């Protein structure tokens, strides 16, 4: 990254300005001297070039006073290896661990695959007929004496349920926020919303409490949200109907029939032209033209053309959170929204699994009502004509598939069952071997014709929901093909020009500046992203420059009034990176992935335009908020607490890699840098930076209490299980 010697005028967004050679930190109330200390002590890259000690590539430049002897926090495996395996897992963790993954590969050395998380359950569960009813007036249990659950509430509380948590002030965070707890007597903080009342016969009856004032305050802010503040909830009846193929997909069926017929005709047509040896036979040429006209006549326009779909907007003030498997769960997305993230995506869902009605896959579509609110955009934003911010929302779905019918049918089902989606994004960047071998994810980069068919079909059946796509530079380092692919996605390929059906109609393209082969071994190539951004700008603004006028796109097939938005993705770790990419790469917005997992307040930094040196106390407060959001999502009963703990530990396996700004010798920080052994400014900061998973468990116990005796957690990499000596 080039040093900045003075404040440069912003060509795109005056709001995001690069620093004038000085490190900037937040002036937090807890540490009023932080900003002054960072400005006076930290060395910028400009000062390095003026004679200060050089910054070592790949090593986090920690100040000498915070370094410790290697033996104190040594790790048997290089930190970079740990990070690479974890970063790959963030893209498709549970697909990576499916059966069929090849074993014994050298690059998998040190990884814990097929991890076992144990279980967190009551010794004996409470019957659902008793869980929410007053002690002496329960609902009738349809299993009667054969029921395997406990029917006596007091016996359950005394003998089968672990003691209540003492965290959160002893008050259930769900009840505190909503005035009611949907987990009843099974809640691990039930004593905060349970009491005894005297009955007419002199007995003491246990009852659950509700707070009407809290319930009024907690009413959903989005009209179509559930009582719990969630959107895109698919009922069990709908999922069963999908699984049993009782839910029809008429638009997909019609499109796929046309696609099959057209593909065969085109194949025959193109094959015949090759045999003509230069096309000397005019009769054959005329016949080919007639066939093309027949194909055009047979094409039935979809009910919603790309130009008629809901308009969207991406801009410098709308940073997006990348789709993240495992890490991109609902509690984490809520946390990012709280810190200024404007767009979120579901975890990657497999199209075939959605078609089969798998509950786990449909559960990925759930979103919090905060994600269903319109994004905050600038009053001077250059929005496309027809864009209505009040109808926009923040949450989109991402799917993957290896066959056109997988993606197309899944899209129609999503549009029908989960209509509260900003976009449906097709994943063409997942590098995981299992996904790649099946022909999905980044494998589609080498099959542009198939990819175009998938996107065109998705557009034909998604109704008002726009279609977007996320790609990589290519599958191999030495042969990037994103420029050719982008041109095809914006203008349409040769087949579409023969049929005169225009481009596939994607509303936005996101490019991750790495190849599939590269993974995270090198930094993202933002110069290539800039090249692609310039190409899209030319295609958006100067359609007349397209030399092949036959391929000039049909305006009816163009989304967003003819503009295809372009987002860059890769290694954004601070507002400095974000501003640099906006101003120098020419992207409309930046999608943040690993940077947000490691420090969710990166969105806050982007909004403020300065570094924020969050104290250990502030960072721990984020962990507490995550715990509350986790209990709200997965439950405050024993099982929910265990699930929250598991996903919190997965998140902490990334957050420990954050080195506080105040400890760095040079700025800006680089996400690829790996730190030597270091200690924090206090014990809590040191604990938050520990690479030992047992310390991560200690952090979860601050809010979730001691782990269940049957709970297990294996870190993604064996080195994180290493116990430091001394």
From Swiss-Prot:
Its EC number is 1.3.1.89, 1.3.1.-. One of its GO terms (molecular function) is tRNA-dihydrouridine47 synthase activity. It is an enzyme of class 1 (oxidoreductase). GO terms for biological process: mRNA processing. InterPro entries: Aldolase_TIM, DUS-like_FMN-bd, tRNA_hU_synthase_CS, Znf_CCCH. Its cofactor is FMN. The active site is at residue 430. FMN binds at residues 323-325, 398, 470, 512, 569-571, 593-594. GO terms for cellular component: cytoplasm; nuclear periphery. It is found in: Cytoplasm; Nucleus. Residues 28-38, 94-103, 113-124 have a biased composition (Basic and acidic residues). Residues 24-56, 68-124 are annotated as: Disordered. Keywords: Cytoplasm, Flavoprotein, FMN, Metal-binding, mRNA processing, NAD, NADP, Nucleus, Oxidoreductase, Repeat, tRNA processing, Zinc, Zinc-finger. Transmembrane segments: none annotated. A zinc finger (C3H1-type) spans 121-154, 171-196. It catalyses: 5,6-dihydrouridine(47) in tRNA + NAD(+) = uridine(47) in tRNA + NADH + H(+); 5,6-dihydrouridine(47) in tRNA + NADP(+) = uridine(47) in tRNA + NADPH + H(+); a 5,6-dihydrouridine in mRNA + NAD(+) = a uridine in mRNA + NADH + H(+); a 5,6-dihydrouridine in mRNA + NADP(+) = a uridine in mRNA + NADPH + H(+). Belongs to the Dus family. Dus3 subfamily. Catalyzes the synthesis of dihydrouridine, a modified base found in the D-loop of most tRNAs. Specifically modifies U47 in cytoplasmic tRNAs. Catalyzes the synthesis of dihydrouridine in some mRNAs, thereby affecting their translation. This is tRNA-dihydrouridine(47) synthase [NAD(P)(+)]. It comes from Neosartorya fischeri (strain ATCC 1020 / DSM 3700 / CBS 544.65 / FGSC A1164 / JCM 1740 / NRRL 181 / WB 181) (Aspergillus fischerianus). The gene is dus3.
